[in-house]
Amino acid sequence: MVGRSERESILRGIRGAKRLQRDLHLDVGASRAQRVDVFGCIARSGATLMFQPLEPLLGAFIREEGVAGIILSTRRPLGMQRFTAAHELGHLVLGHDPHADDEGILRRAPWASDGARVPRVPPEEREADAFASYFLLPPYLIKEQMELRGWEPHHFAQPETVYQASLRFGTSYRATVFALEREHVVGRSLGQQLRSAEPRDLKRQLLGDYALKNAQRVDVWHLTERDEGAVIEASRDDLFLLRLKEDSGSGYVWTFDELRDAGFAILRDGREPVPEGQIGAPTVRRVLAHAKRPLGGQLTLREVRPWAPEDDPQLLTLYCKTATSDEAGLFEPQREELLAAS
């Protein structure tokens, strides 16, 4: 069982996360359903954020002459970067001494109820782990995203659903499983099964015969009508698989001119076979795309009748942004602020 000191460290980390969420108004209004802008939260907390090609370190919290800073490695996927950022932010918020972290913070559970799964670590590390998990994946965010996507607890028995949820949350697959287990969305036994799945295999299953060159760095976003209004913060090499129901029997087709105009290259475009015995059912348009340039702004796709494009079109609106955390240097908004002041 988790000892008292371990439990106290976990609770202290959670309290720190709740306090910062409250102070930054992350737990009210529309913010409750949005992935946490952890890089922005670091800046709002008064620390300088820097990206550097660290190896083997994932990140570090430093403090010199009263000035706080956080350094993150550019050599990790976005989900890992974000968890590391939240972990280092936890060190800052909880008043810890400067510290550097390696991949050990990704392998251990932030909490658990059996001692075999909770390796003993210093109290400050346990606090920062708990802070990071709760800050990036608070109960209200999980609940809001489940409602938006139409996910029920039984859907998370499928590793594919957990992987797609991790992209919406902006966390690693493993961190997402721990948070779902923490909130009793999945049980302990199922959580162990889910952790045995490999995200790289889930990505390849989505892509079928399309060759994925870098399974560690590239994520595959599976987008459907359920993603209406979603904020998509992707890495520059990510792929986007759109599977959209198409009422072709009534003459409706999805148009993707907007996708091209926004800077996407369409890699595959086709329709899935209609299941036997379902003649007249909507077909599923299947499009695989990749962003050729950084994204930033609203993208609206339309399902229309070509001869009457303004006649009751079906819309899918996404808000797309390319993460720049793979570039070395000062966090972009802080760099722009310094340039404006000079």
What are these regions (language model features)?
Residues 1-288, 295-342:
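Active-site hotspot residues in diverse enzymes, especially metal/ion-binding acidic/histidine motifs
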